[in-house]
Every structure is written in structure tokens, then in C-alpha cells.
Amino acid sequence: MVVIGEKFPEVEVKTTHGVIKLPDYFAEQGKWFVLFSHPADFTPVCTTEFYAMQKRVDQFRELGVEPIGLSVDQVFSHIKWMEWIKENLGEEITFPVIADDRGELADKLGMIPSGATITARAVFIVDDKGIIRAIVYYPAEVGRDWDEILRLVKALKVSDEKGVALPHKWPNNELIGDKAIVPPASTVDEVKQREEAKAKGEIECYDWWFCYKKLE
């Protein structure tokens, strides 16, 4: 099983868009990817998730992020299910879906719960260097919230770019709104620097260990 901060395992996979190599396929394009597993094709909760993901796919792509699905179904099942979604729900699925019919990648990533033969609803966010940045699991009986996954991706990218941390429900936090948290001071000198920055109006603080600022 892999964990956050590790390199995504190099693997060749069969998808609805042909055979691709992960994570290189996206890394070579300078893109992040969101790999998400679903328990099975032609099931109600999974259908709502695919419909909702396609509705938001442009928002992911605007961030330089590509979605890619996965289940232990065969590729022809994926294709037929995607046809059904287009014909009955009016959404053409434009992202690839992995046919992991032997469950090898799902097993390697820890997507299959103990005693089960199908995947849970796992989400792996992988950056453009092939590093796993976040992992989220939902049980089969509860569908995911893609808006929260979008928020998570945005927060990771802002954190990388600005060197800050992001609070609960950012950018709609109850305490500091859309502001970002400055990394806590770890030395006496850094405490003084925080106090000086606060005096200059560069940051705001509840205390020296809890400072925040407006993102520019």
C-alpha cells in the first residue's frame, strides 16, 4: 500500500482511451491527475458520481488536472456504461477509465477493502512529478463530493505556490475567510519576525503561532 508523499507506482494500464503508463502519461504533459475508483459499472451511486464528475471536468482541467476512473470491470463494460450515460443522461464521459479487471492496481493501492472483491470509492491526487499528494476513501454506500475534491486540489496548488497552509473549508473559513495561514514560527527569531510583520500590517495574528494573511 502507498501513502501520501510517495511516488505513484509505475504501471501500464488498459483504459477506455487505450493503453497508458502511469504516472508518466500525465507527468510528461505537466499535469496532475485525480485517480478515482468506483465499485462497479451500471450501479446507481457510481452513475451519479460519473455524471457529476463530467459536469465538473472542465473545472479540473482549468487547474491542470485530469480525472481518470478505475474499477475491476472490463473495458467493454466501461464503454457500454458510458454509452448508457450519454444516451440517457446527456453527458458524454470524456476522461479515461481504467479496466483493472484483475484488480492488480487496485490491490497495490489498497483500494479493495478487506474481504471484498470490488473497490471502495478511493481518490488519489497525484502531482505533475508523480507524487501522491492526497488520498481519500469513501465506502461503497456513500458517493463522493467532487466539489470538495476540487477544493482540495486548489488548496494543494495554492499551498505549493504561496508556501502557506489553508484552513477548514477554505476559502470560506468561519474565522479567517479566504485568507491563508502563515506557517507557525519555530524559533525565537521567527516569533520576532511574526510580531514585526504584524506591526507592519503584513499579516494578522490571533497569537504568534496563529497568523494569517491575504493571498495576492
Curated annotation (Swiss-Prot):
Pfam families: 1-cysPrx_C, AhpC-TSA
Active site per UniProt: 46 (cysteine sulfenic acid (-soh) intermediate)
InterPro entries listed in its UniProt record: AhpC/TSA, Peroxiredoxin, Peroxiredoxin_AhpC-typ, Peroxiredoxin_C, Peroxiredoxin_TDXH, PRX_1cys, Thioredoxin-like_sf, Thioredoxin_domain
The Thioredoxin domain, residue ranges: 2-158
A single Gene Ontology CC term: cytosol
Subunit (UniProt): Homodecamer. Pentamer of dimers that assemble into a ring structure.
Keyword set, alphabetical order: Antioxidant, Cytoplasm, Disulfide bond, Oxidoreductase, Peroxidase, Redox-active center
Residues that coordinate or bind substrate: 121
Described purpose of this protein according to its UniProt entry: Thiol-specific peroxidase that catalyzes the reduction of hydrogen peroxide and organic hydroperoxides to water and alcohols, respectively. Plays a role in cell protection against oxidative stress by detoxifying peroxides.
Protein family: Belongs to the peroxiredoxin family. Prx6 subfamily.
Other comments on record: The active site is a conserved redox-active cysteine residue, the peroxidatic cysteine (C(P)), which makes the nucleophilic attack on the peroxide substrate. The peroxide oxidizes the C(P)-SH to cysteine sulfenic acid (C(P)-SOH), which then reacts with another cysteine residue, the resolving cysteine (C(R)), to form a disulfide bridge. The disulfide is subsequently reduced by an appropriate electron donor to complete the catalytic cycle.
Enzyme class: oxidoreductase
Name of the protein in its database record: Peroxiredoxin
